Design a protein with these regions (language model features):
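Compositionally biased terminal segments of proteins
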Residues: 1-166
Length: 166
């Protein structure tokens, strides 16, 4: 880990390289929630790209020694390599808008010398509520509590966030 961040130095190198390549992406899911202070633990980091064919993705992979594995049948494309083994590529996010619409619903989170876009907690909650899978239902109470606590600590966030937290 790096300075209390939930990423190894190798993972940070890949995220930094994506930003250097000007790849439009955001971190979503429980990793995004954890970066906002929610008490979440997850093994994988879900990345949502504006354009999965952006050449900067493969350039960033090459720079850190990673490999692009194309999609096969119903499986989405994947990354392989020490720097990228815990990153998942998300092609579709249910219950919220498309990438361009949701870009306005992100926060810039500093990660030691650079920042990444992270989907806001209320939008993560909306997506998980829509999916309604057992694993999502299990984390929704904690996500909602975290969202309320964050708003209580920073009341200005209540004006920004339009998602219903109850």
């Amino acid at each position: 880990m790096h300075d209390n961040l939930p990423f190894t130095s190798k993972e940070l190198a890949f995220l930094r390289e994506l930003t250097r390549q000007k790849v439009e992406f955001m971190i979503i899911g429980l990793s995004a929630a954890a970066l906002q202070g929610a008490p979440m633990v997850t093994q994988d980091v879900a990345l949502w790209f504006r354009d999965i064919d952006d050449s900067g993705i493969k350039k960033a992979l090459k720079k850190v020694g990673g490999t692009w594995i194309p999609s096969l049948a119903l499986n989405p494309p994947m990354f392989e390599g020490d720097h990228v083994q815990y990153f998942d590529i998300v092609l579709t996010v249910h219950g919220i808008g498309d990438f361009d619409a949701e870009k306005a619903n992100t926060l810039d989170v500093p990660l030691g010398g650079f920042s990444v876009k992270v989907l806001r907690l209320d939008r993560i909650i909306a997506s998980k509520a829509c999916l309604n899978r057992e694993k999502d239902r299990m984390v929704l109470p904690a996500l909602k509590s975290a969202a309320k606590a964050l708003i209580a600590k920073q009341p200005r966030l209540a004006k920004v966030r339009t998602g219903k937290l109850n």
